[in-house]
């Protein structure tokens, strides 16, 4: 069944355009608060805070009540900011003319400046240049191809050269990081590999996984931190292919299983783990591209779709996926249920730049920004199935448009990869609100049944996502 649609007053959108930065309620087009009355340069949002950069000055606001939380009067020429995962740290990037142009502040300890660096590259080339370990006790500084690891007392733990990309990993009280790296042989040729480092001994990698020529790499880690996807990209200097060559490798840390995922010939457009950590999705191949679903252990499960797609957007509750053809494509979007694989809707949003789910997985916010075209800027809000509920065309240029999220202790936490636990949490909430909507979990897949009385909701209907299937016996591979 579809997500229940209730009061829309809590949905808020941050807009940045020529009129300034302001907050509005999109369903009623009501401006709630203005933060600047002139054009500003950037808005960045996290869970607890959002930052506005105006004339090189940085202001920090609370997402809870949009009050001014901190004005950084002593910082000038700010060009970008980045929040750590748990909003404990704020990284501020200043213009290159500043000697120490990359600064890290502890937001939970009176904005203490805990470290600062000299960045020798533009942040877009390796963004974010600063990352943190999952426990936020270690700081990674990535500059060009050099990776330095510090503790929160400014002590250098180790330094690594020839790094193309990396990710921090923590599970079962064990701390690692994975990286794509290369070495230069005596004959001048480069040898590429993926490596796993254990924090108990950073002097040498605990695993070395050889791979083919790699110019660039994208790395994604599953929610339980036990599975890693490496997208190795060869830009192909021979010019035999416009797209170059691209492969995806799967690595299981606990068993050291390392395999190349079999995909259609052509570029890899996008790939992502589902937020609940049970699957990953890959969009690959020459157009029309193929979108395939895999179990988290790397085993192929099924094809989802084939079409002019290059972007994957999975809902936070892992129940829906929007497959999009953005960028140079025509903007076609198809919406699928990840529960039964059904196509549940279609739409088109030509020239869309940003496209994101709301926290509750009910809506998606998309926008045409001036970074793509200077005219016909607009934003739209769609339901999970592509049905448009808000279309707001702007007479001028829009530079940023994003949902403003608010930290809510009562919100269902999707950082749990135990689906059974999530299902029980959902079940309790639905029973309170609808008189008995029951959700059950079977071997990692959520099935939806309604054993209570249906009551009217704002949309006046409850739409099913397909008939409930009979339970089948599963073998071990399906568990």
What function would you assign to each model-found segment?
Residues 105-106, 192-199, 244-254, 337, ...:
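Beta-propeller blade signature
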């Amino acid at each position: 069944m579809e997500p229940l649609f209730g009061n829309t007053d809590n949905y808020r959108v941050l807009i940045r355009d020529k009129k300034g930065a302001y907050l509005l309620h999109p369903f009623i087009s009501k401006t709630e608060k203005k933060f600047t009355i002139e054009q500003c340069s950037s808005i960045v949002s996290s869970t607890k805070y959002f930052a506005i950069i105006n004339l090189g000055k940085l202001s920090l606001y609370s997402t809870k009540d949009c009050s001014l939380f901190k004005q950084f009067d002593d910082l000038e020429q700010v060009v970008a900011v980045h929040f750590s995962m748990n909003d404990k740290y704020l990284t501020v990037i200043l213009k290159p003319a500043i000697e120490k142009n990359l600064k890290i502040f502890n937001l939970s300890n009176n904005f203490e400046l805990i470290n600062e660096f000299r960045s020798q590259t533009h942040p877009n080339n390796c963004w974010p240049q600063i990352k943190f370990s999952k426990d936020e006790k270690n700081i990674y500084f990535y500059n060009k191809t050099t990776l330095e690891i510090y503790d929160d007392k400014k002590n250098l733990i180790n330094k690594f050269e020839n790094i193309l990309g990396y990710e921090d990993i923590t599970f079962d009280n064990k701390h690692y990081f994975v990286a794509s790296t290369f070495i230069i042989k005596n004959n001048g040729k480069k040898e590429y590999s993926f490596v796993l480092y254990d924090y108990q001994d950073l002097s040498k990698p605990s695993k070395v996984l050889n791979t083919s020529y790699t110019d660039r790499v994208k790395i994604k880690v599953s929610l339980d931190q036990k599975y890693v996807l490496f997208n190795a990209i060869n830009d192909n200097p021979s010019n035999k292919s416009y797209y170059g060559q691209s492969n995806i490798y799967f690595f299981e840390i606990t068993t050291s299983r390392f395999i190349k995922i079999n995909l259609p010939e052509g570029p890899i457009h996008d790939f992502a783990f589902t937020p609940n950590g049970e699957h990953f999705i890959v969009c690959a191949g020459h157009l029309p591209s193929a979108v395939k679903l895999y179990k988290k252990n790397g085993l192929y499960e099924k094809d989802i779709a084939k079409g002019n797609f290059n972007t994957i957007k999975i809902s936070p509750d892992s129940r829906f996926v929007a497959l999009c053809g953005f960028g140079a494509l025509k903007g076609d979007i198809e919406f699928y249920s990840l529960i039964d694989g059904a196509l549940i809707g279609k739409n088109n949003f030509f020239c869309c730049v940003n496209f994101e789910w709301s926290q509750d997985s009910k809506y998606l916010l998309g926008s045409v920004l001036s970074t793509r075209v200077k005219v016909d800027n607009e934003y739209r809000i769609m339901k999970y199935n592509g049905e448009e509920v808000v279309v707001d065309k702007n007479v001028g240029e829009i530079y940023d448009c994003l949902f403003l999220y608010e930290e809510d202790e009562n919100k269902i936490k999707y950082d749990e990869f135990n689906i059974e636990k999530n299902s029980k949490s959902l079940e309790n909430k639905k029973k309170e609100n609808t008189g008995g909507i029951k959700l059950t979990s079977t071997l990692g897949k959520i099935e939806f049944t309604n054993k209570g009385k249906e009551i009217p909701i704002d949309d006046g209907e409850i739409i099913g996502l397909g008939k409930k299937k009979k339970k089948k016996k599963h073998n071990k591979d399906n568990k």
